[in-house]
Amino acid sequence: MQEIYRFIDDAIEADRQRYTDIADQIWDHPETRFEEFWSAEHLASALESAGFTVTRNVGNIPNAFIASFGQGKPVIALLGEYDALAGLSQQAGCAQPTSVTPGENGHGCGHNLLGTAAFAAAIAVKKWLEQYGQGGTVRFYGCPGEEGGSGKTFMVREGVFDDVDAALTWHPEAFAGMFNTRTLANIQASWRFKGIAAHAANSPHLGRSALDAVTLMTTGTNFLNEHIIEKARVHYAITNSGVISPNVVQAQAEVLYLIRAPEMTDVQHIYDRVAKIAEGAALMTETTVECRFDKACSSYLPNRTLENAMYQALSHFGTPEWNSEELAFAKQIQATLTSNDRQNSLNNIAATGGENGKVFALRHRETVLANEVAPYAATDNVLAASTDVGDVSWKLPVAQCFSPCFAVGTPLHTWQLVSQGRTSIAHKGMLLAAKTMAATTVNLFLDSGLLQECQQEHQQVTDTQPYHCPIPKNVTPSPLK
C-alpha cells in the first residue's frame, strides 16, 4: 500500500491548483437542486478533456452524468455532488455574516468541495490505471439534487448503478473520520388545498378556506407527533398561505411535509397517517386536497469491511498541517459560534468512534482545526440527518469519510460554513478526501478478496432486507420551489 499512497499523493499534489480552482469556481456559481447546469457541465467537460468517456442526462436527469475510464471489472464509482442551498449567499473568508448578493444561493454544505474531491480522485485513479496497466473501470458519478431532492435515489431507480461493484464518497466536516452511522430515511410531499374565495366580513359563509384546512392539518400532525416512534420526525413548512389580504377567505393554500424515521417502513406508515389527516382537514373545511409526492430517500447502510479499508487510507494521509493564518481565521469563525454549536460538533465526532470516540471528543474541546484522525468503530448509532447516498448503499457496498474543511464547531447550512468553503482550509480538507478515496479505489482494484468480502457483507443484509426504491415510478425530479 505504501507505493499506492505515494503514487496517489504525488498525482493529486501535482494538480493541486487545478482542483482548488475548480472547487472555487463551483463555489462562485451556487445552484440549487436539479438546476446545477453550470456546475455539472464544468465537471463533465473537464473529465472529458482528461480522457474520460462522459454520458450526460443519465437517469433522465439533465444535469446528472457519468464519466468513465478503463475496461471491465471491477467497476468502482466515486460519487460527486455540486448543489448549493437557497438564501445562504456569503462572502468568502469573512468572519461576519456578509452576503455577496442578499437572498441568493450559497454552498452551505460544502458540495463544491465534495464534487471536486471525487473529481480529483477519479483523475488520480485514471493515472494509476494508465501507469500500471491494471484492468477495471473507475467512474465519476455526477449527482445533482442531494439537498432536498434525492437525486441519487432517482438515479438508483433508473438503474444507473446496476453494474457497479462498490462506491466511495465523502462529506466536508470539521473533523477527519468515518461516516459510519445509519441515517434517517425520509419522504417529502406537499398537500395543496383548494377552496372558495369570499369576502371575509360580508359573506364568510360563502367561502371555503384552504388556509383553514392547512391549519387543521398542521394541528392534526402536531398531535400525531405524540403517537409515532421516538426517533421519527415530522417537519412542515407552509409554502402558500393564500393571498396577502386578510379580508379574503383564502381559496388556495399549501403545506410541505418532510417525514423522517430510521426505517423506510416507519416513514411510510407515518406518511399514510399524515395523508389521512390531510383528507380529514379537507372534509372538515369542505375543500379539496391534492398530494404531490416530491422525493424520498432510504437510510444509509454502512459496510464495515469497506469502511475499514477506507479508514486505513485516511489514517495514512492524516490531517492537514495548518498554518498560522488558517488557525487565526478559524479562531475568528469560532468566536461567532455558540457553546451549543461546538458541543454538537463534538457529539458528532464522538458518535463515530464508540467509547474511544467520546474520549477523543473530550480531548478536542479546545481544538481549532482538526489535528488528528478520529478513531473508528462500528456503531449502531443513527445520525439525525438524511442522505440519498442511502439508496446507493442498499444497491452495493458504499463507504464514506469525513474530512476537515472548517473550524471545529461549524454547523452545516450556515453562513460560517459558506465563508470557509472557499479558503485554503477547505482546500486542504478536500484534497485529503480525494487522496483517501483514490487510494481506497486502487486497493479495491488490486485486492479482489477485499471487494468480495465487501460484497458478501452487503449481501448478508440485503438477502433478508431487500431494497425497494421509495420514490414511485411516476414521480420525476423537480427544482426547488
Would you name each region that the model predicts?
Residues 63-64, 85-87, 94-106, 112-113, ...:
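Histidine/acidic-residue-rich, glycine-tolerant segments that coordinate divalent metal ions
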